[in-house]
């Protein structure tokens, strides 16, 4: 029997139902990704599965005593109390006892007075009476598993830690089904990697909504597509779903075209002259009326946005030039000795954990902050368009149209006037939706409105700070195409690995302590170069340490068991090892430079060949030293 079965589900808040006679079956130990366009009803379906929202019609059957928990789309904000208090509330009615026990236990540790000890004894009796010790242990296990400090104030946590706390709150109820709505939103790449690993160890079923294509590929065992009120299951991985979905839409288009052709024929027949009307078949007339109804009820596939950037005249060739830039805040080094040159047309991603200094570096480059030391040169003729969903101001009480055009009927697009409603339709806002207050928009619609407003501004430098949150896959792909065709310079902050892969030519990775590594290519290219550089340095460091120890040992010990010639060779080997290691390290530094792989192929191959030869020479010298040492010691 399925854990959850939904039959004939119907739900509507407007003319077009969110669920139209939908069917869904959820099995044990699977990871189901729910996909669909913005506004299709995915989050509403999650609420239905979590018993927060009812159906207009249809039924849902749950396995007996099934526990379902939901991680909401937005992390908790402005919540008072400790992490323990927040997580414990996932157990609902027993939470108050457990929170009181946690608070009084901390109090006793600092003040073991008789009054506090008596209070602790009372609370312990309540836990005994309600048999809550097992729940207390479960909360502590979940907190330890997530690396959460139970005593920290929830309000002090960053977005990633808030997301972990919310996940802990969902997990303490020990659910068989875990519902995750956009779990990667606002998380940095390191935390997303951690989340993937953690969720793969979850003993139960996961149903999740995500527009992070890398996350979907790594997690999903089945795809469920919500499209125009219908739920369609696609077994297998995400790439297989994309192929099958494309084919299904192609077949639907052909079927609709054939239906429309037949309908047009019947309309011609019904409009024929008196002779035709005398002889016409009443059954055929009824069939025509049914066809008209079917055509009128058809829900068309949601269109694709038509984004277009308003490009300004070209900037100077050098957009930014930085030399030994340093910047720190409250003793924390965010940027240290960073040097780089950004040329016109470069597309660069800034990658690193939340709070590492990505936005700070952008502000330094734009002159909004002053560097502690170093030099930043800003190029000429720059026209900047800056997208930052966290700082962008939208009036929630004004309509979509008024937020964009401030009461005007036209906007200027590429130097030509265009009606506001027509421009908004390019961003998938139908005229009726354009009259809606912003507070009623979904996260994806809000971001589309911000992009629509941004792209009205002429620019030759596009700065995008987390532009992908809440956008559906189709809009993401269009934004990728837009960035690819943009003639100006792009600086991008994003935690969407595939989006970075598809849009940039260089990555700046924040590696800790203010160090920023520059690497050619997209995210996975950059990570590969970074790992290669680390792997190359480790053997060299080990050889240096061993050679230094060997040098000291050679001076210290006698050499009575070696001939004069071999003894001289042994004494000279430590210095040779140091020289070879220095040579290898110099070559490795060349390879690690961000511009290395952009050089002509012949040059890079020569350096790589020299590096391989130096590694072999170092290995042979080290083996010779080991042999002579063993010989000297009678080995």
Curated annotation (Swiss-Prot):
PANTHER family membership: ABC TRANSPORTER ATP-BINDING SUBUNIT (PTHR42855), ABC TRANSPORTER DOMAIN-CONTAINING PROTEIN (PTHR42855:SF1)
C-terminal domain (CTD), binds DNA, required to complement a deletion mutant, as annotated region: 551-635
Enzyme class: hydrolase
Keyword annotations from UniProtKB, A to Z: ATP-binding, Coiled coil, Cytoplasm, DNA damage, DNA repair, DNA-binding, Hydrolase, Nucleotide-binding, Repeat
GO molecular function terms attached to this record: ATP binding; ATP hydrolysis activity; DNA binding; ribosome binding
UniProt induction comment: Present from early exponential to stationary phase in equal amounts (at protein level).
GO biological process, one term: postreplication repair
Gene name of this polypeptide: uup
GO cellular component: cytoplasm; plasma membrane
Summary of activators and inhibitors of this protein: ATPase activity inhibited by N-ethylmaleimide but not by vanadate.
InterPro entries noted in UniProt: AAA+_ATPase, ABC_tran_C, ABC_tran_Xtn, ABC_transporter-like_ATP-bd, ABC_transporter-like_CS, ABCF_ATPase, P-loop_NTPase, Uup
Chain positions recorded as ATP 2 binding sites: 352-359
Summary of the function given for this chain in its UniProt record: Probably plays a role in ribosome assembly or function; overexpression suppresses cold-sensitive growth of a bipA deletion. May be involved in resolution of branched DNA intermediates that result from template switching in postreplication gaps. Binds DNA at Holliday junctions. May be involved in the correct segregation of nucleoids. Has ATPase activity, binds DNA non-sequence specifically; the presence of DNA does not change the ATPase activity.
Major localisation: cytoplasm
Residue span, ABC transporter domain: 1-253, 320-546
Protein name: ATP-binding protein Uup
Binding annotation for ATP 1: 36-43
Coiled-coil ranges from the UniProt annotation: 563-631
């Amino acid at each position: 029997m399925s854990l959850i079965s939904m039959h004939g589900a119907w739900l509507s808040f407007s003319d077009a139902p969110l669920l139209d006679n939908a069917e869904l079956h959820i099995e044990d130990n699977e990871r189901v990704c729910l996909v669909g366009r913005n506004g299709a009803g995915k989050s509403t379906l999650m609420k239905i599965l979590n018993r927060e929202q009812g159906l207009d019609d249809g039924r849902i059957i749950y396995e007996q005593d099934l526990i379902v928990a939901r991680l909401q789309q937005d992390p908790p904000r402005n919540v008072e109390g400790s992490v323990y208090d927040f997580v414990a509330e996932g157990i609902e009615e027993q939470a108050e006892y457990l929170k009181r026990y946690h608070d009084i236990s901390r109090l006793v540790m600092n003040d073991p007075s008789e009054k506090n000890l008596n209070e602790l004894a009372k609370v312990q009796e309540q836990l005994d009476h309600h048999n809550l010790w097992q729940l207390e242990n479960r909360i502590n296990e979940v907190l330890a598993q997530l690396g959460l400090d139970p005593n920290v104030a929830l309000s002090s946590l960053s977005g990633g830690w808030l997301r972990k706390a919310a996940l802990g709150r969902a997990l303490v109820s020990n659910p068989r089904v875990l519902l995750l709505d956009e779990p990667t939103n606002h998380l940095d790449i390191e935390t997303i990697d951690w989340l993937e690993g953690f969720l793969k160890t979850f003993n139960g079923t996961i149903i999740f909504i995500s527009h992070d294509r890398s996350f979907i590929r790594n997690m999903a065992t089945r795809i469920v597509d919500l499209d125009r009120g219908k739920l369609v299951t696609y077994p297998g991985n995400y790439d297989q779903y994309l192929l099958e979905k494309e084919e299904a839409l192609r077949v639907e288009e052909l079927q609709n075209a054939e239906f429309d052709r037949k309908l047009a024929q019947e309309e011609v027949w019904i409009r024929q002259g008196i002779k035709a009307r005398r002889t016409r078949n009443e059954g055929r007339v009824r069939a025509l009326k049914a066809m008209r109804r079917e055509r009128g009820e058809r829900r068309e596939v949601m269109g694709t946005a038509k984004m277009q950037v308003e490009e300004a005249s070209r900037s100077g060739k050098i957009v930014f030039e930085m030399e030994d830039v340093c910047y720190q805040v409250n003793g924390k080094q965010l940027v240290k000795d960073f040097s780089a040159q950004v040329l016109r047309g470069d597309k660069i991603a800034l990658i690193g954990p939340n709070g590492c200094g990505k936005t700070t570096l952008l502000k330094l480059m734009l002159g909004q902050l002053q560097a502690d030391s170093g030099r930043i040169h800003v190029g000429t003729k720059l026209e900047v368009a800056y997208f930052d969903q966290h700082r962008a101001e939208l009036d929630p009480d004004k309509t979509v149209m008024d937020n964009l055009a401030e009461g005007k009927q036209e906007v200027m697009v590429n130097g030509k006037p265009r009606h506001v409603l027509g421009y908004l339709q390019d961003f998938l806002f139908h005229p009726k939706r354009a009259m809606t207050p912003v507070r009623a928009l979904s996260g994806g619609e809000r971001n589309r409105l911000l992009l629509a407003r941004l792209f009205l501004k002429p620019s030759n430098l596009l700065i995008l700070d987390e532009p992908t949150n809440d956008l559906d896959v189709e809009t993401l792909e269009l934004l990728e195409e837009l960035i690819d065709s943009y003639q100006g310079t792009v600086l991008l902050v994003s935690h969407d690995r595939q989006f970075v892969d598809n849009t940039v030519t260089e990555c700046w990775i924040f590696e800790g302590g203010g160090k920023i590594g520059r690497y050619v290519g997209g995210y996975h290219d950059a990570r590969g170069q970074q790992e290669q550089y680390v792997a190359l340095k480790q053997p060299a460091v080990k050889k240096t340490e061993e050679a230094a120890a060997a040098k000291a040992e050679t001076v210290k010990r006698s050499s009575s068991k070696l001939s004069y010639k071999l003894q001289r060779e042994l004494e000279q080997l430590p210095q040779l090892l140091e020289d070879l290691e220095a040579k290898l390290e110099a070559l490795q530094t060349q390879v690690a430079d961000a511009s290395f792989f952009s050089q002509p192929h012949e040059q890079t191959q020569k350096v790589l060949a020299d590096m391989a030869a130096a590694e072999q020479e170092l290995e042979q010298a080290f083996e010779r030293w080991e042999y002579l040492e063993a010989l000297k010691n009678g080995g």
